């Protein structure tokens, strides 16, 4: 059996508010195998999204703080990493698709500028190469006429197209782990099925491990190898 690509041990993430301490995540343990889909399910408010933000060290502080536990990636504890070290990991080794693409995409930058940012920051590409790779990523996620879409702004795209752009951004640097936080929220049923099928196809092609956060057990039954249930 291969070594887990990610191990979370005894994770505790608390929020310190005026009304007291809120244990958003309180002693969480799980591991993710290479190339698998690991699903996290549970009711709203149980800590699913806080878990994903903790892995990427994106908990807003204050009021939130990881007070205990380990997040082991390739033998290194991400909890002990500096912010500078985490910036080199986010989007490169571990990437994330957020719940709502309209609020996650920047409305004042084109699709090409936003996908290209990952290539510029992590791979130091020039403009011409960035443009070429960005078009390739749009084509990979099934967007028609990527040479034209690359110059569009998010408001010019449908919800399904925006989510495909988010997937292209997340997979741009071929991460080892992709965290998909409710990736089909606010999409109609037909588009939901297309997006999940796309994620599965890309996973098989790129060998990426997926942490799928959802409350849809139908989706989980179709694509997940292991499931973790969280509760309040």
Where are the regions a protein language model picked out?
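ABC transporter nucleotide-binding domains
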Residues: 1-232
